[in-house]
Regions:
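Short, charged, intrinsically disordered terminal tails
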Residues: 136-157
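Short secondary-structure boundary segments
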Residues: 91, 114, 136
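Short alpha-helix boundary/capping motifs
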Residues: 107-108, 152-153, 160
Length: 171
């Protein structure tokens, strides 16, 4: 499944996330309260992946899934041992991703992320992953070129219609 990210245009998130769903994609998180996602800053503050996951479990409702972003195989191993629900493989090449999949061995949901766009998404084809997340589907979407020139035509048409439907008292 293809997921968007929170990387959206200010004040346009609701529309951009809706467009992802209409286009067949899925929303990752609408805001920070939707799920717990531990990134490098959280890991650094906690001291380790294991400690970050432990603290997240301790201070969050049991129903919330804990996702952790990892950048190497050592991080994957630690995340699996610590019991992460979702492991995001960030910016990993395909060979490293294949090794990570073996290490995870269905013990967690696998999400691949990092510079994923329309030109390179096929690299994940055939891999046993659950999700691919891409900020490009919102922050790099092509803008539809709209013109207001047609409004002039509509205004002319409405004026003509009014003239034809007006009773002329001089006749």
């Amino acid at each position: 499944l293809l997921l968007d990210t929170r990387k959206t245009t200010p004040n346009m998130r609701i529309f951009e996330k809706y467009s992802v769903r209409v286009g067949g994609g899925y929303n990752h998180r609408y805001n920070l309260s939707d799920a717990i996602m531990l990134k490098d800053n959280h890991i650094d503050a906690a001291g380790s992946i294991t400690e970050a996951i432990k603290l997240a479990r301790e201070y969050s409702p049991f129903i919330k899934k804990i996702e952790i972003e990892v950048e190497d195989l050592k991080g994957v191993e630690e995340a699996v041992k610590a019991g992460a629900d979702i492991i995001m493989l960030d910016n990993m090449d395909i060979e490293t991703t294949k090794e990570a999949i073996k290490i995870i061995n269905k013990k967690a949901i696998i999400e691949c992320s990092g510079n994923v766009d329309i030109n390179n998404i096929n690299r994940f084809k055939g891999l046993e992953i659950d999700y691919i997340s891409s900020g490009a589907i919102t922050h790099s979407a092509k803008i539809l070129d709209l013109s207001l020139k047609n409004l002039r035509y509509v205004d002319d048409w409405k004026r003509r219609e009014r003239k034809e439907n007006t009773w002329d008292t001089k006749r």
